[in-house]
Design a protein with these regions (language model features):
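Arginine/glycine-rich "motif VI" loop of SF2 helicases in the C-terminal RecA-like domain
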Residues: 130, 155-164, 182
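Catalytic cores of RNA-modifying enzymes
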Residues: 1-4, 11, 21-30, 46, ...
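Conserved nucleotide-binding/hydrolysis micro-motifs of P-loop NTPases
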Residues: 32, 68-70, 142-145, 175-176, ...
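Short, solvent-exposed amphipathic alpha-helical segments in soluble enzyme
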Residues: 152-158, 205-207
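Extended interfacial segments that mediate partner engagement and assembly in macromolecular machines
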Residues: 68-147
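Basic Arg/Gly/Lys-rich low-complexity intrinsically disordered segments
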Residues: 1-22, 203-228
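N-terminal cysteine/histidine-rich coordination modules
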Residues: 1-85
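Helix-rich interaction surfaces within compact, conserved domain-sized segments
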Residues: 168-222
Length: 228
């Protein structure tokens, strides 16, 4: 059960948040792990800025890391109260935050791709399904159902991977995957264990939680415990 904090004090800067620390949500006043929150600071123009990577200077406030919580915080004037000063707050602050989290996930995918842990192309992905080191299957959000069904059937038939959860990811468009992996026409891909893979999965988990407020069981195993 979450403890209820007694204040919404500003932090003393991004470096003051230790790994595993808890912070008070400025909206709900609940004490939660920092990994489940988004930090906000005041930018040079007096505007509320999402500090998704927790590196921006200045004192910050924390809000539960879901789209619904940030939208509610904007409506309830939480940022002005939390910072104890007038702060300009964009009406689309939740959308801005989501774009940053999505960008961080795609950046991690790019690093994994450069590290050789992302296989793309239908036939190569189909072959990769039998590997012991496969962690996830990635489908473009605009991929056709036929290819997804065939790969799902291949996965279902494979006894090697049946006993463990393979994360299914379909939140990025083909254009986004092309850009992240610097490859043309990426529709299906497989993520293998290796450099950058767990960081990518942690950021996918963070994006999933931000959008839905919940985590699927397979994704939750990779949820960030720090500022992934």
């Amino acid at each position: 059960m979450l403890a209820v904090a007694q204040d919404t004090e500003l932090d003393r800067g991004a470096t003051s948040v230790a790994s595993g620390a808890e912070r008070t949500c400025a909206l709900t006043r609940e004490l939660k792990p920092a990994a489940d929150m988004i930090r906000f600071v005041v930018g040079p123009g007096g505007e509320a800025v999402p500090d998704v990577k927790r590196k921006l200077p200045g004192r910050g406030i924390w809000v539960t890391a879901t789209r619904a919580a940030i939208e509610d915080a904007v409506k309830r004037n939480v940022f002005t109260r939390g910072f104890k000063r007038d702060v300009r707050v964009a009406l689309n602050l939740a959308a801005q935050t989501e774009q940053m989290i999505e960008r961080a996930a795609l950046d991690a995918l790019a690093i994994a791709g450069k590290g050789g842990t992302v296989i793309s192309g239908f036939s190569r992905v189909e072959t990769a399904v039998g590997r012991d080191d496969i962690l996830a299957m990635i489908h473009a959000a605009d991929a056709g159902d036929d290819g997804k069904r065939k790969l799902a059937a291949t996965l279902h038939r494979n006894t090697t991977v049946k006993s463990r959860e393979i994360v299914m990811i379909d939140m990025f468009t083909g254009a986004q995957l092309d850009l992240a992996l610097n490859r043309p026409n990426v529709v299906h891909a497989a993520l293998l264990a290796g450099p950058g893979s767990e960081t990518f999965l942690a950021r996918v988990a963070r994006l999933t939680r931000f959008r839905t407020g919940i985590l699927a069981d397979a994704v939750s195993a990779h949820a960030p415990t720090d500022g992934a």
